[in-house]
Amino acid sequence: MNGVEGNNELSLANTTTPSHASEDLDLKQDQGLQEETDTVREMEAAGEAGADGGASPDSEHCGPELCFRVAENSCAAAARGLEDAPSPSKGGDAPSAPVAADDSSKNGCQLEGPHSPAKPKALEACGAVGLGSQQMPGPKKTKEMTTTKCAISVATGKEGEAGAAMQEKKGLQKEKKVAGGGKEETRPRAPKINCMDSLEAIDQELSNVNAQADRAFLQLERKFGRMRRLHMQRRSFIIQNIPGFWVTAFRNHPQLSPMISGQDEDMMRYMINLEVEELKQPRVGCKFKFIFQSNPYFRNEGLVKEYERRSSGRVVSLSTPIRWHRGQEPQAHIHRNREGNTIPSFFNWFSDHSLLEFDRIAEIIKGELWSNPLQYYLMGDGPRRGVRVPPRQPVESPRSFRFQSG
């Protein structure tokens, strides 16, 4: 045994209490241990009941720490009792040292000197005895574990609250989107600017195409107009050498025949040519020109009937005055049809500009007779020739012209 241990034993022997003090200390320690044991058992029973009944995890984890504190308090009380006991005399109290040592060993506390480094070990041993057969970690580890578990529990609770807040926020955003979508659906949408630009571009393209078509039509009209004039000139030259060609064509036309009297037929036998000319800019209209040989009825070699469209849109008719020989005027001869009704002379068409029937004469001559005179000339000789040419349908011109005298 070294010197330090000897000194410790000596000091322990010197601090032992007398026999009656030792008995009182033992009684107090027994009562304290009994109370602490009962408290630990109640806490254990409460922990088991909490585990069975769904107690919180925090209370279950904190139970061992409380038990350790109870045991630590009992050892501390024992140590204080030894320190507070009156110091005995050096002489007669030495034999009671073993008794105190035995009592201390019963309580599981090996007490040493007040400044001895073995005091924490004694407290640790007392904690082990207080907890019974359970071997718990040291106080620091137990506190760290308890603090960690409590922190995890608090963090878990905070995460749950944060998740609930996020879910509620998402729900509010969805409701706002749904409400906003309903408002957008009910609101009428204005046409996009891009669509209007596209429509304007298409309209401009159509205008360009129409302008190109007009220019192309004018070019084709001039081209084929020249070709037609060449054929018309050749046709007119041939017709002039056929006696009574035009009077026969007029008489064979179903609509013009009722308008021609016997005297009109005699005057039209001197007719050698018919020309129809369309007027261009700046004058718009149509001109009819009848060419006659010398005859006993009038002095004119040509009679002209002209229709012109004015800037106001009204169509007016103009004609050449007929210079009649004396006593050959149409008014001097009264013509009646089979029903006894008076028939106006065909040549009144050149002088009278008020009758709508005369406007109809201009349309028939331009659209049917002049375009295909051979068809009507051959209508009377059809059975003899064995050929009947179907009437040619007039082609509608883009610049439609309707005759109306005024």
Swiss-Prot record:
InterPro entries referenced in this protein's UniProt entry, alphabetically: NAP-like_sf, NAP_family
Organism lineage: Eukaryota, Metazoa, Chordata, Craniata, Vertebrata
Positions with biased composition (Basic and acidic residues): 167-188
Domain of life (superkingdom): Eukaryota
Residue spans of biased composition, Polar residues class: 8-20
Species for this entry: Mus musculus (Mouse)
GO biological process: nucleosome assembly
Family: Belongs to the nucleosome assembly protein (NAP) family.
Gene3D superfamilies the UniProt entry points to: 1.20.5.1500, Nucleosome assembly protein
Pfam families: NAP (PF00956)
Name of the molecule in the record: Testis-specific Y-encoded-like protein 4
Start and end residues of each stretch annotated as Disordered: 1-63, 81-121, 161-189, 387-406
Annotated Low complexity bias: 93-102
GO terms for cellular component: nucleus
